């Protein structure tokens, strides 16, 4: 049976993020880069993650910490909330929710981020992100179905 892409596109991995993660293609948009980076986390491809961080981040210094994080995180799924161009040329934003199980606690959690990407020489790079705060009465991004104030917002 074909392996579906971890990014949640519904496509086979070989026809979706694998060519990016393996370095045979370059993501043309911030959204494609973000999806391929999620897939790289799932596949434990530290080299791709480091290569797609903006050079100013000096991600090679984090190699061991990234590899260690693979042992304690089981990524469950990705939801892209919004993709937008930035105000400056060569800047883009992707808001997403990534669900995972924390291997230390066994708890299901969610990472909600608005990631910022910058383009250098026709290549997109992850530079940083902010964590949007859901409203207290909004559904919790962890996927529990509860209101944020009764779940992760306590």
From Swiss-Prot:
Pfam families assigned: SEC-C, YchJ_M-like
Domain of life of the organism encoding this protein: Bacteria
HAMAP family assigned to the protein according to its UniProt record, in alphabetical order: UPF0225 (MF_00612)
NCBIfam families: PRK01617.1, PRK01752.1
Family: Belongs to the UPF0225 family.
Protein name: UPF0225 protein Spro_2712
